[in-house]
Amino acid sequence: MSTIEERVKKIVAEQLGVKEEEVVNTASFVEDLGADSLDTVELVMALEEEFETEIPDEEAEKITTVQAAIDYVTSHQA
């Protein structure tokens, strides 16, 4: 099984149509990876599905970087 970090990066790459090597922990979804608001909503939905969790809208708005996504998923795993 892949680590949470690897799984998050794979989802980000797939959802945003970028190469996995571009998905570094410090990358901003919008500024560095070219995501728009719809992309970020779809990304959150993909993370919810992959990690079987629900991310409230107010929390989703704070997830703006790859590291923020990793941190959120790590802290909310059952």
From Swiss-Prot:
Domain Carrier, chain residue ranges per copy: 2-77
A molecular function GO annotation: acyl carrier activity
Record-level GO BP terms: lipid A biosynthetic process
Annotated compartments: Cytoplasm
Residues that bear O-(pantetheine 4'-phosphoryl)serine: S37
Post-translational modification: 4'-phosphopantetheine is transferred from CoA to a specific serine of apo-ACP by AcpS. This modification is essential for activity because fatty acids are bound in thioester linkage to the sulfhydryl of the prosthetic group.
Pathway where this protein functions: Lipid metabolism; fatty acid biosynthesis
Alphabetized UniProt keyword annotations: Cytoplasm, Fatty acid biosynthesis, Fatty acid metabolism, Lipid biosynthesis, Lipid metabolism, Phosphopantetheine, Phosphoprotein
UniProt KW Isomerase keyword: no
GO-annotated cellular components: cytosol; membrane
Purpose: Carrier of the growing fatty acid chain in fatty acid biosynthesis.
NCBIfam families, sorted: acyl_carrier, PRK00982.1-2, PRK00982.1-3, PRK00982.1-4, PRK00982.1-5
Family: Belongs to the acyl carrier protein (ACP) family.
Protein name: Acyl carrier protein
